[in-house]
Amino acid sequence: MRQILLAIALIAAPVAAFTSFELYTSTAPAETVGLGDLSSFRTIIADVQTLASKGDLAGAAKRITDYETAWDQAETAIRPLNQHDWSNIDAASDTALKALRQSAPSADKVSKTLAALMTVLSNPAQPAQ
């Protein structure tokens, strides 16, 4: 009789432990990885916003080229960290670049796209509106 009880205990203990572990890992929220320090990109976009708010859209277009170059160079390091967040920023970047590079850029559209890009740079998990 003791041997049967011992056998049941030796079987039940690992089963309970493994089951508990499986339940815990399946209900624990997935941890997302950030993109690291994006402050240098925010600084450049703040400069672009300042130029655009002063009406210097040509200067803003030149300055956003610095952003584009830095963003493209950092892609291989940043993109693998979090594809979703990177894509959100990249889409907002493309929209801002397009707005500034139109033959006759609209100051209002440029302002809105730059604000959206700055918002996404501050919170990459949220796509631009």
Which stretches of residues belong to each language-model region?
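Mature extracytoplasmic or organellar-lumen-exposed domains after removal of signal/transit peptides
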Residues: 24-129
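Hydrophobic membrane-insertion alpha-helices, especially the h-region
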Residues: 7-18
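Positively charged n-region of N-terminal signal peptides that target proteins for export
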Residues: 1-4
